[in-house]
């Protein structure tokens, strides 16, 4: 070839065209025989041109590729092999291959297809055996190039024909090789495996299997035909080709499986295994293994169910195991054996990956059934045998290559895949219940599993994104999910520890999936401890607090073993989570709150477990709330509290420390309250045995000093909560801070407030409830807010120091109530919440009543009643709501100064008190807040009922015993003092001086002034002999009994209940002991005399002052007046010292003023009494009992009469009136006489009393003319008197209960006529008629008006009242044993002729002051 052509081929396009024209002309000449020196000249010329084309393609970068293809097309038909020089043809094929490879690129695909078509159009000429390599290389390159471009979608779908052409061309090549008997199959297999079969990816083989069988068959059949002809291949070469055959079989198996149109129909792998069986028939080790593989693949390819399939497979697995056991020791290090193991591993991988989908699903279906346990046992044994021999695998071309450069071990990958195959087989197995209990399949499986995980730990290529590890974790999760019996659970327990070593390599989500399935499978653990450990592992792995909380709730709901908390179980778990410190703390915090909130009564071991694992002091405070019966926990709380208080002296406490102080203080407080409780019957709280009760029940330690510690604990808790609350929003919570349990804070704050309220310390209780109100408002805790507000609504006077606008809070509460009360019936609320809403309505009614909104108050009470009637559990029962409604109505009635015409008339206050007594007696608890509310309500009722009854001169002792029983059993000193003060007030009103003396001793004991034990010692050492009671003669005793019985039969009140305006000296009855010097009255009003433990509390100062007022009244009634002047002067100074303290006395200040007025009148200081009475009348506040105003007015008018008497008339002996309740006035009342005569005539058959007008007794020695005789006025040697006047009548009290019935038949006060006392003559006429029958008592209703008249007072009318009404008169309810001790067993006091009396006014007997 000339140099011009060479230059032209590398030149421009026109130059290339010129060269192409020259070459074309040249080959035309060759075809005509011109210029041919020999037969090889055209071939040599063509080679020279092809060489230049190769160089030109390289230099011009395919710029003229189309022209080059045209030049090649011109030359190829004119060349053929030259037999004498085979190298020329080899060079020709090499040049064509180079040009085709150069054109097989994306930018020259058209020229490539043109060039390949040109090569394919020429006959396949194999001059030498090695020439097939060039053709095969061209076909494979073209096939792979077109496939690659089609994957990139750079060619149209029609380009698929090029693939068909390539496959057909390879089939032609294989036929040519078979015809030429080319026996070099080793190189052919290597080239085919590298480019088309075993070394290609799974995706490529899937694509290849998807090609039409018409094209692929034209390649597969010639290839298998070529491979079947060994042409006497030596055994050594066959041994070397063993790996390539296995690789080709593996690829054909995949092609058979992936075939779309007819999977497993071609059975290419089986055909190749038959060929290999024949090829290796003389190579014994390989021959047997190929036979086993042939039958194994044949079973895989089965398309129909056969009867003996299971047994066949079991026998085949046993033969494999036998072969591996006997040949493994000999050939384990040989390459073919290692290749065989790797091939079998890949075959098993293909088999198990298609277990649940065609075409191998039939194979797995036939393994199920009755004998599936034996089949799977054989299968697991086969895999276990392969796994044991695979440890000898060093290298194999069949092994999968790892993408990680650090991993070069095929052995580890082989072992890992064997283990995953076993896990997949186990997951696909569906055993029956009986088969699950068979342990035979689990034994080889456990070995496989353990070895696989051990190998996985040592692999360097495994990571969170490694496909092998992801698949292994997924399989382990499915194994755990499959667990349904303890035998299956043994597999899970086997991989726990190895899996823990792999945990750093596993993605968090994948690991969480495994742990979740282990969590569910743990229910089948034989050991409950292990089950709890496994469950705690999954729970600890949850980092979302909400999800963790819900899962913990479910765990503790279904847990069979609650000896430890989840946090502690996790610490001993075989798979502990690698938690950060923040996650560890979060786990404990959520675990703690779940136990405290979800379990109403957590088991003690569970709480102790949480206590052992606590992280800070706040955890101890929360746990102590549930372990208040544990003395050790309470001791720890006390130590923590002391430690924090010590720290507070050195540095400010953090808010969490303040919160811990609050909770620990409550724990210590409640334990102390519980420890001081005792039990005794309510019958033991009788009035005459209170001191014995204190001694008998070991209550000598009960006093105000001991209770001071409890108050300190409660106030310390509230102070801690308040300090925390003030800083709650100012400082954000850090990651190390424990979430605040606001529910626990509210509960403990309410417990402190309830303790203070129940103990009676109202100032401290107000602060506690105000804090709770603010917390409830901030947290939108509606029921907490309403409960706190209810405390303030029930108070008559709010503390001025409190920053509380009650009117604004009431408006806010009304909005809440309007939203809440319609929803209470929906069942979304607890019973205690129902109670809170209804109690708030009741106390809000009380609030509006104090604001003079009576109609609004009544409407609120009606709403509460209607709301209560909607709950079936309250209907027909006396619950706290009903008692509260009755109490509020009682307050509305007896504290109302004027009646509203628009409101219905209610029963009288005393009758309402009787109703309240019945309701309390029949009390029924409905919710958890009822008992506390009842105790607070009873404390108010004791005070209010005492005030109401005392101002009406009647006795209402029903609440005293109940309340005293409650407070004494609870060990509450201040509440006991309040009850005893009320009782003492009533005793003094009724002049029960013995009982009053006992109350004073008890009060001194409770106030820690003089212990009762010392009093009892002094009382025991003293010798008290009642003179009169021990020396009274029989006649005097009979007379005393007779007069007492007469009074009882006549239903007459004792003389001390009469409102006598003459204040002559009344000598008291003898007391059991004199008042010692330590009981000086001055100590009650002097700052120095007040005990130190009472000086710091305004409430206790007021209590002490009230006791002093009552003590002064007691001294006055005993006529021990030496200290009273100094006391009342000191009391006035005490009251002026602190107006706020004075205001807290309430109605007891009015009582004190009335007592003071009475004393001033007794001392004839009428002017001073008048000024005090006028001031007192003005000081009565609007909401006070109306009787206070009446009492001040009575004292005022009486003092005026005593200051300016109208005239003095000679007072006659008071005679016993035949009509009862007559006033002992100077002038006789004619109306009474006429009324009594008329009544006698209208009831002729009525038995009458026998009145003794005279008694032949000698006058006593030393008898004085005082208005009342002392019990020491006589002795046993007193001679009988010649005359005893028993005509003095004792007035019968008219109770409020009788007012309505009496007023019906009684004329108006203006129509009443004056009457005179019954003359003695009329009395004497009746003295002879004392028969066995008694006259029906006649009740006289007194006028309420007050007149000043010189000689007469308001008349009284006589009215008969039936004796069958048991509730109409309090006198009828009084039993014999209720008669005051001062009137029993004691001679009747003699009434000598009095001096002329001053003119007095007739008043109601209940206005006694």
UniProtKB/Swiss-Prot annotation:
Compartments where found: Cytoplasm
Cell cycle keyword on record: yes
Main function: Required specifically for chromosome disjunction during all mitoses; maternally provided protein is sufficient until mitosis 14 then zygotic protein is required. Involved in formation and/or maintenance of epithelial structures: bud extension during Malpighian tubule development, and foregut and hindgut morphogenesis.
Gene: thr
Disordered: annotated span: 1260-1284, 1297-1409
GO process terms (BP): cell division; Malpighian tubule morphogenesis; mitotic sister chromatid segregation
Residue ranges, compositional bias (Low complexity): 1264-1273, 1300-1310
Residue span of region Separase cleavage-site: 1052-1058
Protein keywords: Cell cycle, Cell division, Cytoplasm, Developmental protein, Mitosis
Domain of life: Eukaryota
Subunit structure: Interacts with pim and Sse. Cleavage of thr contributes to inactivation of Sse.
Assigned GO CC terms: cytoplasm
Name of the protein in its database record: Protein three rows
């Amino acid at each position: 070839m000339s140099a011009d052509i060479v230059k032209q081929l590398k030149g421009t396009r026109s130059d290339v065209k010129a060269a192409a024209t020259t070459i074309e002309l040249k080959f035309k000449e060759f075809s005509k025989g011109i210029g041919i020196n020999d037969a090889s000249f055209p071939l040599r010329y063509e080679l020279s041109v092809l060489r230049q084309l190769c160089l030109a393609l390289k230099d011009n970068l395919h710029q003229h590729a189309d022209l080059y293809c045209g030049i090649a097309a011109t030359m190829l038909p004119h060349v053929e092999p030259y037999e004498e020089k085979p190298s020329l043809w080899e060079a020709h094929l090499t040049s064509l291959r180079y040009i085709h490879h150069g054109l097989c690129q994306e930018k020259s695909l058209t020229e490539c297809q043109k060039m390949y078509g040109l090569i394919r159009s020429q006959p396949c000429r194999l001059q030498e055996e090695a020439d097939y390599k060039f053709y095969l290389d061209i076909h494979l390159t073209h096939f792979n190039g077109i496939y690659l471009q089609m994957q990139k979608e750079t060619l149209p779908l029609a380009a698929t024909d090029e693939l068909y052409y390539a496959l057909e061309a390879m089939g032609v090549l294989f036929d040519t090789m078979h015809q030429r008997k080319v026996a070099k199959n080793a190189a052919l297999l290597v080239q085919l495996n590298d480019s088309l079969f075993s070394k290609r990816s799974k995706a490529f083989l899937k694509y290849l299997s998807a090609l039409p069988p018409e094209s692929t068959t034209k390649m597969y059949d010639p290839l298998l035909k070529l491979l079947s002809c060994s042409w006497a291949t030596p055994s050594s070469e066959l041994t070397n080709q063993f790996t390539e055959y296995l690789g080709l079989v593996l690829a054909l198996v995949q092609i058979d499986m992936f075939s779309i149109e007819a999977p497993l129909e071609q059975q290419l792998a089986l055909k190749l295994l038959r060929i290999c069986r024949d090829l290796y028939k003389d190579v014994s080790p390989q021959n047997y293994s190929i036979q086993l593989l042939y039958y194994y693949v044949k079973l895989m390819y089965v398309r129909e169910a056969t009867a003996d399939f299971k047994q066949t497979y079991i026998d085949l697995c046993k033969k494999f195991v036998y072969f591996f056991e006997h040949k493994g020791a000999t050939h384990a290090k040989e390459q073919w054996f290692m290749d065989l193991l790797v091939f079998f591993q890949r075959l098993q991988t293909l088999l198990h990956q298609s277990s649940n989908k065609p075409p191998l699903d039939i194979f797995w279906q036939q393994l199920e059934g009755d004998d599936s346990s034996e089949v799977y046992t054989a299968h697991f044994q086969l895999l276990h045998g392969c796994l044991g021999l695979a440890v000898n695998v060093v290298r194999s071309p069949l092994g999968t290559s790892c993408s990680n450069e650090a991993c070069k071990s095929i052995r580890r990958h082989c072992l890992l895949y064997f283990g995953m195959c076993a896990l997949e087989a186990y997951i696909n197995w569906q055993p029956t219940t009986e088969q699950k209990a068979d342990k035979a399949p689990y034994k080889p499986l456990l070995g496989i599993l353990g070895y696989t995980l051990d190998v996985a730990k040592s692999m360097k290529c495994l990571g969170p994104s490694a496909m092998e590890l992801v698949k292994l974790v997924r399989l382990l999760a499915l194994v755990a999910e499959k667990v349904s019996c303890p035998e299956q659970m043994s597999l899970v327990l086997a991989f726990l520890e190895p899996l823990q070593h792999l945990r750093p390599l596993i993605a968090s989500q994948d690991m969480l999936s495994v742990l979740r399935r282990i969590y569910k499978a743990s229910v089948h653990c034989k050991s409950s401890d292990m089950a709890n450990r496994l469950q705690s592992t999954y729970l600890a792995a949850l980092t979302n607090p909400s999800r963790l909380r819900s899962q913990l709730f479910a765990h503790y709901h279904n847990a069979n073993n609650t000896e430890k908390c989840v946090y502690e179980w996790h610490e001993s778990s075989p798979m502990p989570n690698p938690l950060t410190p923040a996650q560890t703390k979060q786990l404990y915090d959520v675990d703690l709150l779940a136990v405290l909130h979800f379990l109403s009564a957590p088991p003690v071991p569970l709480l102790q477990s949480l206590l052992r694992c606590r992280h800070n002091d706040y955890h101890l405070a929360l746990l102590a709330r549930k372990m208040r019966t544990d003395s050790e926990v309470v001791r720890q709380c006390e130590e923590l509290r002391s430690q924090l208080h010590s720290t507070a002296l050195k540095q400010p406490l953090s808010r969490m420390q303040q919160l811990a102080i609050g909770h620990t203080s409550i724990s210590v407080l409640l334990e102390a309250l519980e420890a001081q409780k005792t039990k005794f019957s309510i019958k033991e709280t009788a009035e005459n045995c209170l001191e014995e009760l204190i001694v008998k029940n070991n209550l000598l330690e009960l006093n105000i000093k001991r209770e001071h510690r409890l108050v300190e604990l409660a106030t310390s808790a509230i102070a801690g909560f308040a300090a925390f609350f003030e800083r709650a929003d100012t400082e954000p919570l850090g990651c190390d801070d424990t979430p605040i349990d606001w529910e626990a804070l509210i509960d403990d704050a309410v417990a402190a407030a309830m303790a203070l309220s129940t103990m009676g310390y109202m100032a401290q209780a107000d602060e506690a409830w105000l804090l709770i109100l603010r917390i409830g408002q901030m947290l939108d805790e509606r029921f907490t807010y309403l409960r706190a507000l209810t405390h303030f609504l029930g108070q008559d006077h709010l503390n001025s120091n409190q920053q509380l606008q009650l009117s604004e809070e009431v408006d806010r509460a009304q909005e809440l109530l309007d939203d809440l009360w319609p929803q209470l019936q929906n069942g979304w609320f607890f019973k205690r919440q129902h109670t809170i809403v209804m109690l708030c309505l009741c106390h809000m009614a009380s609030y509006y009543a104090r604001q003079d909104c009576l109609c609004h108050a009544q409407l609120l009470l009606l709403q509460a009643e209607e709301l209560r009637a909607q709950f079936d559990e309250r209907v027909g029962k006396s619950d706290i709501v009903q008692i509260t409604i009755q109490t509020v109505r009682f307050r509305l009635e007896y504290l109302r100064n004027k009646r509203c015409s628009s409101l219905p008339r209610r029963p009288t206050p005393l009758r309402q008190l009787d109703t309240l007594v019945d309701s309390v007696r029949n009390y029924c608890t409905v919710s958890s807040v009822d008992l506390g509310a009842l105790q607070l309500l009873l404390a108010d009722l004791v005070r209010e009922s005492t005030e109401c009854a005392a101002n009406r001169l009647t006795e209402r002792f029903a609440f005293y015993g109940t309340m005293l029983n409650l407070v004494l059993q609870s060990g509450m000193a201040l509440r006991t003092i309040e009850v005893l003060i009320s009782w003492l007030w009533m005793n003094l009103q009724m002049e029960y001086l013995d009982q009053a003396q006992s109350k004073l001793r008890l009060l001194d004991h409770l106030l820690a002034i003089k212990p009762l034990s010392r009093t009892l010692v002094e009382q025991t050492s003293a010798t008290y002999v009642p003179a009169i009671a021990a020396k009274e003669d029989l006649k005097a005793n009979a007379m005393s009994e007779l007069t007492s019985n007469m009074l009882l039969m006549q239903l007459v009140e004792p003389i001390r209940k009469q409102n006598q305006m003459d204040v002559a000296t009344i000598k008291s009855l003898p007391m059991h002991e004199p008042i010692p010097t330590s009981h000086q009255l001055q100590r009650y009003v002097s700052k120095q005399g007040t005990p130190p433990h009472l000086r710091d509390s305004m409430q206790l100062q007021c209590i002490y002052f009230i006791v002093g007022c009552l003590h002064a009244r007691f001294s006055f009634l005993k006529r021990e007046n030496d200290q009273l002047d100094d006391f009342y002067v000191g009391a006035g100074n005490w009251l002026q010292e602190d107006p706020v303290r004075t205001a807290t006395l309430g109605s007891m200040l009015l009582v004190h003023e009335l007592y003071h007025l009475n004393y001033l009148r007794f001392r004839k200081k009428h002017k001073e009494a008048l000024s005090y009475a006028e001031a007192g009348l003005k000081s009565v506040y609007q909401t006070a009992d109306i009787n206070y105003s009446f009492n001040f007015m009575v004292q005022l008018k009486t003092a005026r009469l005593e200051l300016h008497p109208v005239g003095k008339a000679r007072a006659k002996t008071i005679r016993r009136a035949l009509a009862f309740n007559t006033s002992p006035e100077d002038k006789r009342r004619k109306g009474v006489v006429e009324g009594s005569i008329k009544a006698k005539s209208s009831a002729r058959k009525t038995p009458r009393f026998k009145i003794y007008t005279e008694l032949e007794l000698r006058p006593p020695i030393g008898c004085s003319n005082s208005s009342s005789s002392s019990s020491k006025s006589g002795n046993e040697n007193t001679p009988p008197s010649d005359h005893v006047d028993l005509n003095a009548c004792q007035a019968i009290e008219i109770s409020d209960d009788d007012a309505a019935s009496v007023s019906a038949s009684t004329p108006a006060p203006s129509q009443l006529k004056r009457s005179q006392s019954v003359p003695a003559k009329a009395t004497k006429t009746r003295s002879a008629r004392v028969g066995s029958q008694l006259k029906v008592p006649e009740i006289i209703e007194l006028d309420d008006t007050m007149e000043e008249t010189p000689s007469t007072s308001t008349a009284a009318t006589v009215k008969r009242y039936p004796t069958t009404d048991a509730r109409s008169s309090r006198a009828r309810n009084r039993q014999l044993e209720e008669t005051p001790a001062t009137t029993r067993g004691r001679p009747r006091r003699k009434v000598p002729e009095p001096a002329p009396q001053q003119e007095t006014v007739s008043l109601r007997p209940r206005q006694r002051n």
